[in-house]
Design a protein with these regions (language model features):
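Short, well-formed alpha-helical segments that are part of the catalytic scaffolds
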Residues: 14-30
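Hydrophobic targeting segments
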Residues: 4-10, 37-39
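A recurrent flexible, glycine/aromatic-enriched loop bordering the glycosyltransferase active site
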Residues: 128-153
Length: 223
């Protein structure tokens, strides 16, 4: 394990998006003494399988899992995340948007989401802003699930490709897995959004089936 390496992991089926994503990564300020690596997984069978494949190939302590249409615009993103991890070894994963308490439905959108994000849709860009200061005085909010557009870890926990073999609920599942392993999942305090997510059109064809799996595994049978 390389304690001074940060690996960005991107599952992609669109190299133009991936190149733009990597453009922003390469313009981040890298903390002194650290190095970065970028792994792309093309045409993965599922998000979980792609992430597991890349995770096993990397020796970096810190890993940033992100969509190919996520663009990191906060130049000090890496320093901010590493600072949180080093001061709080019990924190296993950081997101930019999350829910304090997962609804019984298993759908994050059914609860208040905290954090900041520029969401770029087909015809407009929206600012999602629900400051964590409204419910905590800490510089981060402990949450039960984070949105998968960006997920930053300091420990490796396998993604549940045995259960989620498509493109939905991998993020909520991984959040629950970190909590099951005794780690905290958090959303940090932000003055401005750290990322832009070019959402485009959202496909929900497999969503309900994956939701039912999630509810059965994590909501009906909590550990």
């Amino acid at each position: 394990m390389n304690e001074k390496e940060i690996c960005f992991i991107i599952c992609t089926n669109n190299l133009l998006y991936a190149e733009e994503c990597m453009y922003y990564i390469r313009h981040l300020n890298v903390p002194a003494g650290y190095s970065i690596d970028i792994l792309t997984v093309e045409d993965a069978h599922s998000m979980t399988s792609g992430y597991n494949e890349a995770m096993q190939c990397s020796h970096a302590k810190y890993k940033v899992y992100l969509h190919h249409d996520t663009f990191i615009v906060h130049r000090e993103f890496l320093s901010a995340c590493i600072d949180i991890f080093q001061k709080n070894p019990q924190i296993g994963m950081i997101g930019n948007v999350g829910v304090h308490k997962m609804p019984a439905s298993g759908v994050m959108w059914d609860a208040d989401r905290y954090g900041m994000l520029y969401e770029q849709h087909i015809y407009e860009t929206q600012l999602l802003m629900n400051r964590i200061e409204s419910i905590t005085e800490q510089n981060y909010l402990e949450v039960e699930a984070i949105d998968g557009f960006i997920m930053v870890t300091q420990y490796d926990i396998p993604w549940r490709e045995d259960l989620f073999d498509k493109w939905d609920f991998y993020d909520a599942s991984q959040s629950m897995e970190f909590i099951r392993h005794g780690y905290k999942v958090v959303v940090p305090k932000m003055e401005q959004p750290w990322c832009v997510h070019d959402c485009g059109f959202i496909s929900l064809g497999n969503y309900e089936g994956e939701r039912q799996k999630f509810v059965q595994e994590y909501m009906d049978n909590p550990r």
